[in-house]
Amino acid sequence: MTRLENMYKKEVVPALIKRFGYSNPMAVPRLVKITLNMGVGEAATNKKVLENALADMAKISGQKPIVTKSRISVASFKIRNGWPIGCKTTLRRSKMYEFLDRLINISLPCVRDFRGIPPRSFDGRGNFNMGVKEQVVFPEIDFDAVDAIRGMDIAITTTANSDAEAKALLDAFNFPFRN
């Protein structure tokens, strides 16, 4: 069991029950999954770029990502239907908690001029989305071996019914929100 899983069971659940008045510990919001997505537009013309993005994503997430393909043809982007244009992976259970721990305690403090995450990134249904502009903030990525700086999207899916509950859950995990 990871450090954040222990923290969730021993500290977060009782604190949220006290704050929101849940009658059952199973009603307390919990993390369901974390989805990482990396769009690589240059992959339509250069296959090596996609291979490097897949390798970076595999190092960051600890599991093999899948290639995402375009759903429609767009002439202005010079892509056709079915061409590979990115990669994504979904983390659940212990890998999810390990990634979240590394994100909160190691990666986000390494971001230049980091002042906190804006709390307006909730979607209204208790899920949280954020972007990272550089993949080199993760300790698994060797800065000298990187061919290009790529960003990624991170979507944290919870069972919370509202943004307030989801924010309280992520606050309990010491998520660095901006004031």
Swiss-Prot record:
Keyword Nucleus (UniProt): no
The entry's keywords: Ribonucleoprotein, Ribosomal protein, RNA-binding, rRNA-binding, tRNA-binding
Single GO MF descriptor: rRNA binding
GO cellular component labels: ribonucleoprotein complex; ribosome
Family the UniProt entry places it in: Belongs to the universal ribosomal protein uL5 family.
Quaternary assembly: Part of the 50S ribosomal subunit; part of the 5S rRNA/L5/L18/L25 subcomplex. Contacts the 5S rRNA and the P site tRNA. Forms a bridge to the 30S subunit in the 70S ribosome.
Role, per record: This is one of the proteins that bind and probably mediate the attachment of the 5S RNA into the large ribosomal subunit, where it forms part of the central protuberance. In the 70S ribosome it contacts protein S13 of the 30S subunit (bridge B1b), connecting the 2 subunits; this bridge is implicated in subunit movement. Contacts the P site tRNA; the 5S rRNA and some of its associated proteins might help stabilize positioning of ribosome-bound tRNAs.
Protein name (database record): Large ribosomal subunit protein uL5
Phylogenetic placement of the source organism: Bacteria, Pseudomonadati, Pseudomonadota, Gammaproteobacteria, Lysobacterales
